[in-house]
């Protein structure tokens, strides 16, 4: 199923009922968080994700997203993706902004880009199940903790996102927008900067990707420099009756050859840094920026809880109420903390 909730329900049913008809499944971060401590997934520490290859993967992602409470790594990342910042260079040049490296730079660009009628400095995907990514990104940039809504960094992040609305730097029209709608507006020149996953294929297809058009930009440092990585990971159903064959397949997926094949077949950036170094061409516009992300920023998996989709939706609903002025920041923080505790 392509619908997020339906897909997760189907895979939950397969795993929770001990269905032996499926051996290996590829799951996203939301499902990894929901499943990793249930016993439904086979641990891979001694068979696949062994010490000799672990350092080639993003350690923060492995620890945050696919390691169970008892220390078992339950997945093999299929690719490496970042929630990158993308800018429209034409707009940067038009408004005379040369860099967006700090909070002050970011504000200056948003303000300048928003001066043109019908254009906003910042564009988002603020539909209730999508905006979670941006809330968490700003919380990290302001030095907060997504699980602790008494943290001052969290408050600063939410205040800033509301400030963007109040100053006309972003639009409440995007409250229903998912990535498809956001990207179309970005391509059309309606936004100056967005946060988005992937390598920009949508922009390339529209003829709008390039150093002088839309391109990836290093995430600015506010209180700290931080970025999220994501993946879909291959996991082994603990009820599988074909585990030896599955181990053979998963070892290949985790190997240099498997990661290279995944890149060549699916155009997904390799999860292994050593493979990325050798198979991704030097003229690939993403390669240098991904290396910069890995070397200069804190890299984490996204903050998620076992009741993942419920948590994401609840936080999105609260956020929409807050930016529309329906609840106060204090109310948001109190209810956000309740959501954290209720969905653990």
Question: What residues fall within each predicted segment?
Answer:
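Extracytoplasmic "Venus flytrap"/periplasmic binding protein-like
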Residues: 1-60, 94-101, 185, 190-193, ...
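A local structural motif
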Residues: 1-2, 17-21, 96-98, 163-177, ...
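Hydrophobic residues within well-ordered alpha-helices
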Residues: 11, 106, 113, 136, ...
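Beta->alpha turn/N-cap motifs
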Residues: 27-31, 179, 196-202
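Hinge/lid segment of periplasmic solute-binding proteins
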Residues: 28-83, 107, 115-117, 134, ...
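Long, aromatic- and glycine/proline-rich binding clefts that accommodate carbohydrate-like moieties
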Residues: 65-66, 214-217, 264-317, 321
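Extracytoplasmic/periplasmic substrate-recognition and gating elements
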Residues: 72, 94, 166-169, 206-269, ...
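Glycine-centered hinge/linker elements that transmit conformational signals in sensory
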Residues: 110-113, 147-175, 219
